[in-house]
Amino acid sequence: MHGRLKVKTSEEQAEAKRLEREQKLKLYQSATQAVFQKRQAGELDESVLELTSQILGANPDFATLWNCRREVLQQLETQKSPEELAALVKAELGFLESCLRVNPKSYGTWHHRCWLLGRLPEPNWTRELELCARFLEVDERNFHCWDYRRFVATQAAVPPAEELAFTDSLITRNFSNYSSWHYRSCLLPQLHPQPDSGPQGRLPEDVLLKELELVQNAFFTDPNDQSAWFYHRWLLGRADPQDALRCLHVSREEACLTVSFSRPLLVGSRTEILLLMVDDSPLIVEWRTPDGRNRPSHVWLCDLPAASLNDQLPQHTFRVIWTAGDVQKECVLLKGRQEGWCRDSTTDEQLFRCELSVEKSTVLQSELESCKELQELEPENKWCLLTIILLMRALDPLLYEKETLRYFQTLKAVDPMRAAYLDDLRSKFLLENSVLKMEYAEVRVLHLAHKDLTVLCHLEQLLLVTHLDLSHNRLRTLPPALAALRCLEVLQASDNAIESLDGVTNLPRLQELLLCNNRLQRPAVLQPLASCPRLVLLNLQGNPLCQAVGILEQLAELPPSVNSILT
C-alpha cells in the first residue's frame, strides 16, 4: 500500500469537521467580542470595519454589526479627505456586493446599501440598476432586490416606461414572476393616470386589453402558476363603494334612530361626524353601535328625546348629515305611525358588484369565455375555476347563480384543502343574491333556509327585516353583527350547529327565537337573551342543554314573558 494516500474514515472526517467548526466559532466569538468592546470604548475606527468585515462576510444577517459599521462611517466622514472618503465608499460598496453573493436576500445588506447611497452627493444610479439586473437574473423573485430597485428607480427618476420595459423582459423570460407582475400594477397607473372623474388606478381600455392578452399568454402557458392569476384579478379590478347612507330608520316606540352606511365608520372621530336635524333644528345626540362596542361599524344609532316624537304634530322630519361622505338622508315619521324609514332602491351593481369589477361588461364577458376555454383544457385548475366564478358574479350574480353553484362544487372537489374557505365564499354570494331578491321584491322577510350556509355576512343590509329564516344550514354561531337587525321580530335558526348565542343581543323587537336541534351545551349560553326585552317564545328542543343541570335557574333569569320550550 506504499505510495497511496491514506483515505480518512467517516469518523475521522466527522471529527475533522467538528474541530473546524469549533475553530470558526472561536474566531467568530472573539471578533464579535472585540467589536463590542471597541464600540463600548468609543473606538470607532477602521479596525472596527475590518473586524466586522470578517464576521459579516460569512454571516451578513448580523444586524447589530451593520449598525456598528454605520457609526464608524459617520465618524470617518468628519475625519477623511474627499479623496479618502471616496475610496472608502468604493471599498464599502464592493464589500456589500460580496455579502450579497453570500446571501442575496440579506435584509441588513440591502438596507445598508440604501443608507450608503443616500449619503453620497452624486451616487452612480446606473451602476445600481445594473447590479439589480444581475441579481434578478439569478433569482427574479428576490423581493429584497426588487425593493432596492424601486428605491433606485425613484432616486434616479427613471421614467416608468423604462421600468415597465424592464418587467417586460423578465416576464417574457419567465411568466412565473410575481414581483414583475406586481411592479407592473404599480407602474401602469403612473403611465396612464385617469382623470379626476374616473376610477382611480384603472386603465384605459386599449391598455387593459393589451395587458389581458399578455396575462392570458401567461396562464395558458402555465395555468397552475398563481402570479399571473393574481395580476389578472388586479386588471379586472374592484371599485371602492361610494360613500352613502344606505338606510335611515326611526322608531317611536323605542325612541331610537338608526342609520346604516356603505362602509364601516367610527362616529365621533375627527373625520367621521354625524349631524342630526329634527324638523330642521339641530339635535345633539350620543351615537353608539348596536352591540355597544366603540369600534368601526356599518350601523349606528341614537336615542331620541320625547319632544322629537310628539304624536300631536302631523309629522316629524329627521335628517342625518354625514360630513365626511358629504351625503345626507331624510325620513318622515307620520302621526299615528310607530316607525318611519327611508331606504334608496339600490341595484346589485351598487350593493355588491362594485367589490368585484369596474370594467365594462364586454371585457368581462370576453374574459369569461377565455377562462371557460382554458377550463375545458385544464378541468381541474383551481385558479381558472375561481376566476370563472368571480367573473360571473361581476357580470350578473342572479343570472349565473345556478351555474356558479355548480362551479363551486367542482372547485371544492379540485381543492379540498380550501373547502371551508370556499363554503364561506359560497355562503357570502348566496346571501348577497337573497338580499338582492328581497330588495327587488320590496319585502321585509328573508328566507335563507336550506342553503347550506356556513357564515353570515352583509347583516347591515338587513336593518328593516322583521322575519329571518336561517333554518337547516351549517351555521355554528350567530355573529355580533346580528344586533344590526333592529326591526327583527322572528328569528328561525333551527337545525344548524349553533354553539353560542353571543350575537343575539340587544334586539329590541325580537319576540320569537327558534333554536331546535342545535349544539347548545351549557345553560350559560342563554345569558345574552336577557337583553332582548320582548322575547316571548324560545324553542330549545333537541339541544344538549335541555338535559343540563341548572337550565331552569338560567331560564328564570330571562324576562318573565318568555315561554320556553325544552322538550
UniProtKB/Swiss-Prot annotation:
Any GO BP annotation: protein geranylgeranylation
Keywords assigned by UniProt, alphabetized: Leucine-rich repeat, Phosphoprotein, Prenyltransferase, Repeat, Transferase
Regulation: The enzymatic reaction requires the aid of a Rab escort protein (also called component A), such as CHM.
LRR repeats: 442-463, 464-486, 487-508, 509-530, 534-555
Stored SUPFAM superfamilies: Outer arm dynein light chain 1, Protein prenylyltransferase, Rab geranylgeranyltransferase alpha-subunit, insert domain
GO function term, MF aspect, one: Rab geranylgeranyltransferase activity
Gene Ontology, cellular component aspect: Rab-protein geranylgeranyltransferase complex
Coiled coil: none
Repeat region (PFTA), residues: 44-78, 88-122, 124-158, 159-193, 207-241, 363-397
Modified residues annotated as Phosphoserine in this record: 98
EC numbers on record: 2.5.1.60
Catalytic activity: geranylgeranyl diphosphate + L-cysteinyl-[protein] = S-geranylgeranyl-L-cysteinyl-[protein] + diphosphate
Pfam families given in the database record: LRR_1 (PF00560), PPTA (PF01239), RabGGT_insert (PF07711)
Cystine residue pairs: none
Family the UniProt entry places it in: Belongs to the protein prenyltransferase subunit alpha family.
Role summary: Catalyzes the transfer of a geranylgeranyl moiety from geranylgeranyl diphosphate to both cysteines of Rab proteins with the C-terminal sequence -XXCC, -XCXC and -CCXX, such as RAB1A, RAB3A, RAB5A and RAB7A.
Subunit description: Heterotrimer composed of RABGGTA, RABGGTB and CHM; within this trimer, RABGGTA and RABGGTB form the catalytic component B, while CHM (component A) mediates peptide substrate binding. The Rab GGTase dimer (RGGT) interacts with CHM (component A) prior to Rab protein binding; the association is stabilized by geranylgeranyl pyrophosphate (GGpp). The CHM:RGGT:Rab complex is destabilized by GGpp. Interacts with non-phosphorylated form of RAB8A; phosphorylation of RAB8A at 'Thr-72' disrupts this interaction.
Protein name: Geranylgeranyl transferase type-2 subunit alpha
